[in-house]
Structures are given as C-alpha cells and as structure tokens.
Amino acid sequence: FDDDFGQWTSPFIMAAINTRVVRRSNALLGFPWGKDFRYDEATLNASRYQAIRNSVAGGVGLVALALGPTRALAQRLLPKPGEGPSREQREAGYYEVFFRGIDPSDRRRDTVLKVRGDLDPGYGSTARMLGEAAVCLAKDELAVGGGFWTPASALDGKYLERLTAKAGLIFEILES
C-alpha cells in the first residue's frame, strides 16, 4: 500500500530498467537531486485484490518465462514480432503516470507531477519518444561528448520541448 497515493500497488514491469536510468541521470547531471536521491516505480491498483492478483500474475509469468518448457509454450502462444496491437488499438490507447517528489526535510515541499501520453504506451508513444530523441541527436548541439548517456543527461530541455510539441506528452504539476 502506498500511503502517499492512498492506493494499493504492484510491481511495474519496466521499473527494473527505468529506475536505473533515472538514478544514472542523477549521477551524470552531478547529483542535482542529492546523493541520497531514491527513485522507485510501481503500478497503482484500484483494490488490494487487484494488487495481489497483478503481483502474483507477474511473478508467475516471470518464472514461466525463465523455465525452458513454459518459455517454449509462451513463444508459441504470445504475439510474434510485428503482431502487436492494431493501428486503431495503438491510437485509442493512452496512459497517465504520476510522480511524487518527496522532500524528507520538509514534506510541505512535496510535489506531484502527472505525465499523460495520447497513444498506446508500449508501441505508439514509445516510438514517438524514440523518434524525437533521434531528432535531438541529429539536429541539436549537445553539451556532452561521446559515451553512455541517458536521455535526460544528454538531450537537455530540447527533448522535453519536442515531447510536448510533437510526441503527444503532457506534463502537469498537480500539487506543489
């Protein structure tokens, strides 16, 4: 249960990657959020039952994909590359992500941010984000040289501008 959002949570499948990218961005940018910065992601659920169901289903799915026989079965049953949602489904999709920034020294400074995307998150919106990152790399003068950078640390504010202008993302501060 997440006390800040007042909802039950379950693991978010992309958290294993996203959390590392966010923490690396903090380090590459010189720790603007502090060296004690913490970041985590979870899926908000409507009820305790839904949180338990989603957690169990995700765990069973991961175990099944780790075992040879069930992985082979899953490969036969799950969609193949290129067999994802239809164009209509991608265009009808959307998502909302809520972030809560917590200032442990003064909780009155906590901030809630909502990000909304106007397409399916797994296909449409991700493709737009990748496309706008490519435009930044091709057209903008970057403040960084070669190496392994995160989008936030290499693409600066131009990327955020492109995401809101051309990729269908809306960033909104709800509480501050």
Whereabouts are the PLM-identified features?
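C-terminal catalytic/substrate-binding lobe primarily of soluble NAD(P)-dependent oxidoreductases
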Residues: 1-176
